[in-house]
Amino acid sequence: MFAQALHWLTTSKLRYALALPFLFFILYTKTKKSKEQELENYIFSLPREKLDQIRGKPDEVINVIDEYVEQGHFLMNIGKLKGKIISEKIQQVKPKVMIELGGYVGYSAILFGKQLTDPSAHYYSLEVNPKFAKIASKIIDLAGLSNKVTIIVGKATDSLVELRRSLPNVIPSFEYLDFVFIDHWKDLYVPDLRVMETLDLIGQGSIIAADNILRPGVPEYVKYVQGSLDYRKEYDSTVSNVNGPQFIGKWNIIYKSKTIKVDDGKREKDAVEITEYIEAK
C-alpha cells in the first residue's frame, strides 16, 4: 500500500512537490530512534576498552547513564538523589524479594538490585513495554546483574498474579514482598497497590517506595497510603479498581507513610513516598 501511494505521489511533478514534506516525515518517523534506543546506542557504541572497563560493574554503568542524561538527554529514571534515599532504605531493610512496577531501561533495577547483597535475594522488574524490556535486559546484563534481576514483560496486574502463584514454589519461605518500588503509570499507583493488597503480597515488614510524588504528582496515591482506615474503607467500596473489581484492596491495613522531598537545584522539586506496612486491623 505504501509503495502504491509513493508511486502515485511521484508520477506528477506537482504531486511530488506537494508530497515532498509528507515523504520526508514518513522517512523520518520510520528511521528515527526513540530516546531509549538512543541510550542503548550510546552505551554499546562506547569504545571496546570502555565497555570492558564497565562490564560487570553496576556503579560504572549507572554513571554512564547519568552522564548521558547530564548531556541533555531526558530519560524517565529515578536519578541519583531520589535513588540514594531508596537505596539507603534497601540497605536498612535487606530485602530478600524486591519488585519494581515500571522497569523502563533498567536504571532502577541496576541501582537497587546491586544493593541486594544476600546471594539468595532477588529483584523482579515488571515492565509492560517489550521494547523497553529488551533494552533493559541488555543494560542489566552489561552491569553483571542478570543473575540477580528477572524482567517480567506484561501488564503489572497479570505479572503480580503470576508472582503470587510462583514465588512460594521458588522461595519456600516466601510470605510477602519485602520491598516494592513503584515508578510506572501514575494513574495505576493506587490500582496496582490494591492488587498487591488483595493478593496478600503486602504484609508484615513490607516497604513500598514510590517515585514522582510531586512531579508530575500522584496526590491520590499519597492520600491513599497516608489516609485513615475510614478513608480507605470508603475509597475501596466506592472506587472500582480499573484492574478488575476483584482487586478491591484491604482497607484495614495500617500504613506509616512519609513524603521525602528532593531538590537538585536544577529542576522542579520532586519527592519519593516511603510507606511501611504496620499491621492489619
UniProtKB/Swiss-Prot annotation:
Binding-site residues for substrate, renumbered to this chain: 186, 212
GO cellular component: fungal-type vacuole
Cofactor-binding details, from the entry: Binds 1 Mg(2+) ion per subunit.
Keywords noted in UniProt: Catecholamine metabolism, Magnesium, Metal-binding, Methyltransferase, S-adenosyl-L-methionine, Transferase, Vacuole
Primary localization: other
GO biological process, any: methylation
Entries under InterPro entries matching the protein: SAM-dependent_MTases_sf (IPR029063), SAM_O-MeTrfase (IPR002935)
One Pfam family per UniProt: Methyltransf_3
Name of the protein in its database record: Probable catechol O-methyltransferase 2
Organism from which the protein derives: Schizosaccharomyces pombe (strain 972 / ATCC 24843)
